Design a protein with these regions (language model features):
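Pore-lining transmembrane helices
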Residues: 6-280
Length: 280
C-alpha cells in the first residue's frame, strides 16, 4: 500500500505504510534523545552546584522545561522525515503536544506533566500525519486556515480522548512487574531485568512504569541493571558502525535512539533477552 505525499500542487514522493511508520518512529527516537540528553549530561551536575549558588537551581528547571517539550521536538523531526513543508511540520508538532498529555488542565490553569505519554504521542502522530497527507493541497488557499484545525487540533483532541486507554498499557506493565516482586528472588530479578531490557527501546516510558510499581531494594537494582544491559548491547553493536556522537549518546544511556532499528530488526531482541537473563 502506498501513500502519496503532496507539496504544493506537485506529487513529490510515494511512501509505503512501512516507510511512513518508520519515518515517524525515527523522529520519535531522535526527539526523545534530544529532549533528554541535556538533563542526562547536566542534571546531576546542576543539583550538586545548586548547593553553592541558586543560579544552578534555575538552570536545572530550564532542563526540565526543555524535556517537557519532547513531543514538540518529536513532531518536528517526524514532519521533516515525512518531507512535510514548514506549516505542515509545526501543525504535526502541535497535535503531538496536545495528544501527549504533557499539560494537564486544572481549575487553576495548566499543570506540567513531564514529557507526557510517548505511546499516545505515537498514536497522535499517526492520526495527524494521516490527515495532513490526505488533505495535501486539496483545500488550496484555505489550507493555512483549516489545516491547523483539521490536522492539528482535532487529532490532538483525539489523542487526549485515548490518553486514558494508553495509560492502561503502562498500568498493566506496572502491575505485572509488581507481581514479579512476589516471586522467588532469583526468578524475580531475572524477570524484572529482562522486562526492562526489552522495553527500554520502545515508546513505553519506564519511568512511568517504575512510578506505578514503586520498586525498591533488589527489585530496583534488577531494573537498573536491565537498563544497563540494553544500553551495552546497543553500545557494542554500534562500535565500528556508527559515528562517535551516536556511540557517546549510547554510552550515557540514550538507547531509545535505536527504537526504529529495534522494530525494523526484531532479532535484536535475542541478545537483549540473553543479556537481561544473565545480568538478572
Amino acid at each position: 500500500m502506498y501513500i502519496t505525499v503532496f507539496k504544493g500542487v506537485h506529487m513529490i514522493e510515494q511512501q509505503t505504510v512501512k516507510s511512513f511508520f518508520f519515518n515517524i518512529l525515527n523522529g520519535m527516537a531522535l526527539g526523545i534523545v534530544i529532549a533528554l540528553i541535556p538533563g542526562a549530561l547536566l542534571g546531576e551536575v546542576f543539583k550538586f552546584l545548586a548547593r553553592y549558588s541558586d543560579i544552578f537551581t534555575t538552570l536545572g528547571s530550564f532542563l526540565t522545561m526543555f524535556s517537557i517539550g519532547a513531543s514538540l521536538i518529536i513532531g518536528v523531526l517526524a514532519g521533516m522525515n515525512l518531507k512535510f513543508n514548514a506549516p505542515q511540520t509545526v501543525i504535526l508538532a502541535g497535535a503531538a503536544f496536545i495528544g501527549s498529555g504533557a499539560l494537564k488542565v486544572t481549575p487553576n490553569g495548566f499543570l506540567a506533566n513531564g514529557m507526557g505519554d510517548l505511546i499516545n504521542v505515537l498514536f497522535t502522530l499517526f492520526i495527524s500525519a494521516g490527515v495532513i497527507y490526505f488533505i495535501g493541497n486539496r483545500l488550496g488557499s484555505l489550507n493555512i486556515v483549516l489545516l491547523p484545525v483539521l490536522g492539528g487540533i482535532i487529532p490532538g483532541a483525539i489523542g487526549q480522548f485515548i490518553l486514558p486507554y494508553s495509560k492502561l498499557v503502562t498500568g498493566a506493565l506496572g502491575n505485572a512487574i509488581a507481581h514479579f516482586t512476589e516471586l522467588n528472588p532469583l526468578l524475580m530479578t531475572i524477570l524484572i531485568a529482562t522486562t526492562y531490557t526489552l522495553l527500554l527501546v520502545t515508546p513505553i516510558s519506564l519511568v512511568a512504569v517504575a512510578t506505578v510499581t514503586s520498586l525498591s531494594g533488589l527489585a530496583s537494582g534488577a531494573a537498573n541493571l536491565g537498563i544497563v544491559a540494553a544500553c551495552y548491547v546497543f553500545l557494542f553493536g554500534a562500535l565500528g558502525v556508527n559515528n562517535r556522537g551516536t556511540i557517546t549518546a549510547l554510552a550515557i544511556g540514550t538507547a531509545k535512539m535505536m527504537m526504529a532499528n529495534y522494530f525494523k530488526h526484531p532479532i535484536i531482541a535475542v541478545p537483549l533477552l540473553i543479556n537481561g537473563i544473565v545480568i538478572g
